[in-house]
Amino acid sequence: MKKTFLILLCLSMLLVACGGSAVETVEEPAATEEVETLDAPATTVAETLDKIVFGFVPSAEQAQLLDNIQPMMDLLSDGLGIEVEGFVTSDYSGLLVAMGSGQADVGAFATLGYVTAMNAFPTRFEAIAKSVRYGSGSYHGTWWTTDASICKSTPVIGAFENINGVPTLVTGSTTASPDVAALQVGWGFGDDGLIPEVRDGVTTSPGLACEADISVVTGEEVLFVEEGSTSGYLYPALQLKNMGIDYVNGITPRFAGSHDGVIAGLYNGDAKFGVTYDDARRTLRKTNADVGEKVIAFAITDEIPNDVIAVRTDLPEDMKQKIYDILAEYIATDEGLAIMDEIYGWTDLVPAVNSEFDVVREAAEEFGLYDD
């Protein structure tokens, strides 16, 4: 495609070289060449490094994010026995360059950001943890339509879930949310679980879904998020390719620029097909309570691994394990859960499995993100 990632990477490297860096300039950790000494007795963290730098990408105002992560940095410092400094980059390419150049030791990456980082610096990165959101370690893209005539049967209150690898329509009712991982439009949290959502006296319509063949988009205008969106373009476009549908010439692709932009475009009649994460209809519910019945789910993509925490591969193994243990224990506390849910929507951490990212790598290769 347009080599978007490589352009960002080059710009980020140029900024770092010129001193106008997209990340805070931090002192490179000393003596990293002594990290792996097979014949030496196990070293303590304090003997190996004097500081760990943990990078984040903004999900809110930078100052607020720094305030939110400070308690976690303090816990890591206490547990590791050395200073842990948190810093915020301007974007994922900035975090990639910071870790690839040794300016940062740990980073919180989105899935595609981690995969492209691994390709750019194949020996520098290692994912130690994957985030969990409300019990799920993955998510998917959802295909939407405003044309109920494409449905094989009348749309119902429900949502799609990949069950044993098979996209399955899970139904709900006016009083019971469909039992799926993603929080669906029309539902909110009550004392006893999910309840119908009422805002300012207006009931938000529960989301409708139906089964339809993805091939119905052939020859049609389709709203995508942006070319770098995993759930909002890469996975669904790869899905079309694998079905024998040209995702450039077999449809008319349009890019709304954001997930809520896709939903708004569908709601306003700009197109009758689109794709976002599940359930992006919630972004429009405050102003358009009927979005769940006007924008209908009809298919989903394969599962996409959640965000990861990656570390430099040359960190000591005992340090990697301690970092994981401290973070996993932190998010299991009320304070840690509240902070991580606010920052990234994380509710738990599990060990990362490298093979889970193979489909993301396939998509990155298909769309030229690895081109020279």
What are these regions (language model features)?
Residues V45-G113:
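Extracytoplasmic small-molecule ligand-binding "clamshell" domains
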Residues V35, A46-F56, A60-P71, V311, ...:
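An extracytoplasmic/periplasmic, membrane-proximal ligand-sensing/linker region
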Residues G19-A22:
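Bacterial signal peptide processing site
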Residues F125-G135, G250-T252, R285-E303:
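Short beta-strand->loop
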Residues L14-A17:
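C-terminal motif of bacterial Sec signal peptides marking the signal peptidase cleavage site
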Residues G86-V97, C210, S215, D246-A264, ...:
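Short helix-initiation/N-cap motifs at beta->coil->alpha
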Residues K130-G232, L238-M243:
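A conserved helix-loop-strand patch within extracytoplasmic ligand-binding domains
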Residues A108-P122, L238-N242, Y267-N268, K272-E293:
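A ligand-binding cleft/hinge motif common to bilobed small-molecule-binding domains
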